[in-house]
Amino acid sequence: MVMEYLVLEKRLKRLREVLEKRQKDLIVFADNVKNEHNFSAIVRTCDAVGVLYLYYYHAEGKKAKINEGITQGSHKWVFIEKVDNPVQKLLEFKNRGFQIVATWLSKESVNFREVDYTKPTVLVVGNELQGVSPEIVEIADKKIVIPMYGMAQSLNVSVATGIILYEAQRQREEKGMYSRPSLSEEEIQKILKKWAYEDVIKERKRTLSTS
C-alpha cells in the first residue's frame, strides 16, 4: 500500500510537470487528414511540443482512428475533438484573438519561420492530397510554406506539422513561455484530476489482468 502511494505520488508529480508546460494558446487543427498513421503521428508531436488541444474535421463525418503503436500513449495527454463545421470553429478562435495559420502553397504564402508563434495560434494542416480547404484558406491570417529544394513540392502532413510546431516551440522557449504555466491553477487541478483518475484506473485494470 505504501509503495502504491509512492508510485501514485510520483506519477501525479510527473503529470503536473507536463501540465505546467502545456501551451493552451497553441492549437492544432487537422483539416480532413484521413490517414490514421499521419493523424496519430500528429497527436504524438502535439504531446511532445506541449500542445493541449487538437481539433479535427473529417469530410465524411468519421471519428478519427488512433494507432496506439504510433502514439505510444501520447493520445491520452492531448484533448482531441471532432468538429463538424471547421470554418465556424476557426472563426470562433479568431474572435477570441487567435491567429489562424494555414499550410498553403501560393504566391502569397510566407516562409513558416516568419510567423510569430508566440501569439495565440491555431495551426491548420490539411488533407494528404488536397491540402487545406479553400474555405479555410480564405479566412486564414497567415498562409505558410516550408522551403523545398528538391523535386517534391510538399512534405508528408505529419512531418510538416512537426517541423512547424518545433519552430513554434523554439520561439516560445526563447520567450520563456515554457517556464511559466499558461494554464491557471484551477485548470491544472481540473485536468490533473481527470488524467490521474484515468491513469490510475487503467493501471489497476492492467495489474488485475496480469495477476
From Swiss-Prot:
It holds the Pfam family SpoU_methylas_C. Homodimer. Keywords: Methyltransferase, RNA-binding, S-adenosyl-L-methionine, Transferase, tRNA processing, tRNA-binding. Belongs to the class IV-like SAM-binding methyltransferase superfamily. RNA methyltransferase TrmH family. SUPFAM superfamilies: alpha/beta knot. InterPro entries: Alpha/beta_knot_MTases, rRNA_MeTrfase_SpoU_C, SpoU_MeTrfase, TrmH, tRNA_m1G_MTases_N. This is tRNA (guanosine(18)-2'-O)-methyltransferase. It catalyses: guanosine(18) in tRNA + S-adenosyl-L-methionine = 2'-O-methylguanosine(18) in tRNA + S-adenosyl-L-homocysteine + H(+). S-adenosyl-L-methionine binds at residues 103, 146, 155. Its EC number is 2.1.1.34. The keyword RNA-binding applies. The gene is trmH. One of its GO terms (biological process) is tRNA guanine ribose methylation. CDD domains: SpoU-like_TrmH. Catalyzes the 2'-O methylation of guanosine at position 18 in tRNA. Type II methylase, which methylates only a subset of tRNA species. GO terms for molecular function: tRNA (guanine(18)-2'-O)-methyltransferase activity; tRNA binding.
